[in-house]
């Protein structure tokens, strides 16, 4: 059976810590979408690890880690991550169906961002997915055969010829790209496998599989705050599509949310706090992007968005992250509805324009940092947790009270 870990906000919820905390109980940990525009931050034995493509199970020697077919892969960045770990043989596998991000994709991304101003990381994620949908992309499996790779490269050079100047590719682009593959392909080849068959067989044999998403539900290309979204499907449903596991294989869906809200880049954010309180949350929560180092926009927990995300994903349990960031705040707000042009909205709309948050205020608490038992939390903190559970309709089974792996309350 497989369990899914999915972010139910705008990403950066703390999925890495949760996966790292529970990965030891699984045979496989699988990253099922996105690219190196997302980052997993894990603190292990006092050392901070920032992972962008590698599944969070790499810190456990007995865990097999898979990058599945819906992930788009920068082979340069993946090679750099691989070099930071030892003994990855037979522990890391990359789907032969996953698509390769080319340097061209990053150039195109930067060019388009000038006019669209979506707030992308300009890592080439979107353009790579564009080529995938246009059926013109290069897949990891193509790297296993030099003849096929050469054919794919020639087709790529022909297709981009009209855009070389616009995307500032340079006169030596063809030569440079061939050198690029020559440098990184030998390092990547040993890890490329038919991971779809591997996972189907593992599931049939009763292996325990953990499916790890990137970004968050509200950034989903179809169901998120379009056009300010990522280029992939971020909900739990995409875990099946990417891995080849059928929906019957899914057991638990663990939704990850912070005790407050954050967002990186542009786009609507009804519960954003533009006062010094937002700055306080950012500073105390160390809310800066793992990948870009950009400061995250911060605000109060949005239960309208949270209920929507839980319904989309079929969450069976929740993990509440960074409760300790709210320590010492006298009055804590929670968005319980929106108001738009005199109308109260309790369902998440497709367009958040003109939506104003309706808040309910709770008394704060002094300290929760480092607490590992529910009974040791102050009454006001427990009341806050119970309110979230009641409103969302999903039990909170895990509460994080610091970045350290051990500072976790299990319920």
Swiss-Prot record:
Pfam families: Adenylsucc_synt. Mg(2+) binds at residues 12, 39. InterPro entries: Adenylosuccin_syn_GTP-bd (IPR018220), Adenylosuccin_syn_Lys_AS (IPR033128), Adenylosuccinate_synth_dom1 (IPR042109), Adenylosuccinate_synth_dom2 (IPR042110), Adenylosuccinate_synth_dom3 (IPR042111), Adenylosuccinate_synthetase (IPR001114), P-loop_NTPase (IPR027417). Its cofactor is Mg(2+). Disulfide bonds: none annotated. It is found in: Cytoplasm. This is Adenylosuccinate synthetase. It comes from Helicobacter pylori (strain HPAG1). The lineage of its organism: Bacteria, Pseudomonadati, Campylobacterota, Epsilonproteobacteria, Campylobacterales.
């Amino acid at each position: 059976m497989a369990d899914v870990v999915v972010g139910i906000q705008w990403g950066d919820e703390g999925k890495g810590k949760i996966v790292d905390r529970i990965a030891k109980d699984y045979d496989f940990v699988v990253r099922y979408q996105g690219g190196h525009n997302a980052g997993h931050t894990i603190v292990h034995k006092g050392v901070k690890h920032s992972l962008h493509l590698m599944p969070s199970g790499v810190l456990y020697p007995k865990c097999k880690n898979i990058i599945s077919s819906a992930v788009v892969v920068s082979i340069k960045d993946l090679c750099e991550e691989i070099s930071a770990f030892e003994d990855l043989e037979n522990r890391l596998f990359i789907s032969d169906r996953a698509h390769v991000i080319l340097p061209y994709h990053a150039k195109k991304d930067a060019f388009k961002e000038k006019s669209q101003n979506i707030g992308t990381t300009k890592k080439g994620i979107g353009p790579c997915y564009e080529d995938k949908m246009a059926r013109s992309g290069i897949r990891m499996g193509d790297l296993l055969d030099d003849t096929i790779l050469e054919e794919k490269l020639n087709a790529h050079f022909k297709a981009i010829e009209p855009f070389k100047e616009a995307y500032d590719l340079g006169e030596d682009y063809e030569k440079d790209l061939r050198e690029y593959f020559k440098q990184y392909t030998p390092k990547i080849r040993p890890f490329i496998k038919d991971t779809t068959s591997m996972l189907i067989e593992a599931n049939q044999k009763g292996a325990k599989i953990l499916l790890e998403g990137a970004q968050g539900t509200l950034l989903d290309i179809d169901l998120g705050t379009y056009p300010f979204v990522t280029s992939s499907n971020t909900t739990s449903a995409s875990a099946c599509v990417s891995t080849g596991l059928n929906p019957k294989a899914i057991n638990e869906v663990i939704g990850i949310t912070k005790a407050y809200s954050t967002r990186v880049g542009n786009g609507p954010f009804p519960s954003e706090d533009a006062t010094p309180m937002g700055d306080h949350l950012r500073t105390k929560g160390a809310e800066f992007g793992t990948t870009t180092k950009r400061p995250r926009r911060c605000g109060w927990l949005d239960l309208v968005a949270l209920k929507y995300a839980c319904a989309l994903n079929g969450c069976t349990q929740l993990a509440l992250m960074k409760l300790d960031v709210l320590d010492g705040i006298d009055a804590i707000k929670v968005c319980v509805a929106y108001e738009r042009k005199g109308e109260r909205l309790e369902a998440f709309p497709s367009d958040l324009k003109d939506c104003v948050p309706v808040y309910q205020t709770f008394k704060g608490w002094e300290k929760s940092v480092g607490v590992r038992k529910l009974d040791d939390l102050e009454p006001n903190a427990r009341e806050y947790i119970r309110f979230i559970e009641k409103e969302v309709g999903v039990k909170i089974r895990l509460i994080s009270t610091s970045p350290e792996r051990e500072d976790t309350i299990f319920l």
